[in-house]
Amino acid sequence: DRQYTRKGERTNTNIMLEHNFIFGGFTLSAGVLANKNTGLDNDFRFYPGVDMSYRPNDNWKFYASWNKALRMPTYTDLYISNVVQQGDINLNPEKNSTFKVGTQYRQAGFAATVSGFYAHGTNMIDWVQTSVTEQNDSKYHVMNIGKLNNMGYNVDATIYMRELVPNSFITRIKLGYAYIYQDHKTETNILKSLYALEYLKHKVVFGLDHQIWNKLSASWSVRWQQRMNGYHPYTKVDCKLMWDEKKYNIFVKADNITCHRYYDLTAVKQPGLWIMAGASVNLGW
């Protein structure tokens, strides 16, 4: 039988204060979270946040946000110990500060979004390998990996064909691209990371929805992405067939229809062709 030899206890208390201000097309939401976690001490710590948006007209929206946050190490991070994982009871909580800015545009038949972000983290927690011995044994240990800065942007554009051509058999076309740049500062030579350093640098998505016959339609998705630190870029193609009625919906979904073998975050081998089917019923309640 499995024996559990570690236990922990901590109480987390949150007090939230928020105020919303609306004037014309301008909206401001500001707040602060007071947090006390007995896993640290009995003191309250304060984490502010601000969200702003401005709509000069019905087509445009501009927005920005900033917030601070704290993440406590989990009990797995602290206590686990086996042949492939080693926790650390001396972990510090990780601290994050994130700033986002963006704009949205919408008109008949077309929508677009452009956004950017900057995230600064200290004492970031990750599972890593720092020696050849750990690599040979496929063993990871958890640690605070230092300072981590992530910055990037996202661009999305969507064409709603039936708002432009009412009888078009193509209903929607979507194209998106996301990019992330990462700057990591640490005094430890990290050979392999499971999470934080295996970031998604490039991601391109293409989507197409169209009618087939009567109430039968299809939705196609093509995704290309490149994850850093030892991952090969790959392309994944998915398709979903749907029959829509007023009272119910039936679908069949095929993920990775090219049966491409690929690995994603934490070096886990992903499934080949994956087929799912389902239905939903509208009860009219």
Q: What is each PLM-predicted segment?
A:
Residues 122-123, 239-285:
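C-terminal beta-signal and adjacent terminal beta-strands/loops
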Residues 118-120, 141-226, 280:
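Gram-negative outer-membrane beta-barrel transporters
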Residues 17-21, 50-54, 101-105, 116, ...:
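Residues on the lipid-exposed face of transmembrane beta-strands in outer-membrane beta-barrel proteins
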Residues 30-36, 50, 64-68, 77, ...:
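Transmembrane beta-barrel strands of outer-membrane/channel proteins
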Residues 6-39, 43-49, 168:
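Surface-exposed extracellular loop regions of Gram-negative outer-membrane beta-barrel proteins
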Residues 40-42, 55, 61, 68-122, ...:
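Outer-membrane beta-barrel signature, preferentially recognizing the C-terminal barrel domain
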Residues 1-7, 40-47, 75-82, 89, ...:
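Outer-membrane beta-barrel translocator domains and adjoining extracellular loop/strand segments
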Residues 22-25, 58-59, 109, 162-171, ...:
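Short loop/turn motifs that connect adjacent beta-strands in outer-membrane beta-barrel proteins
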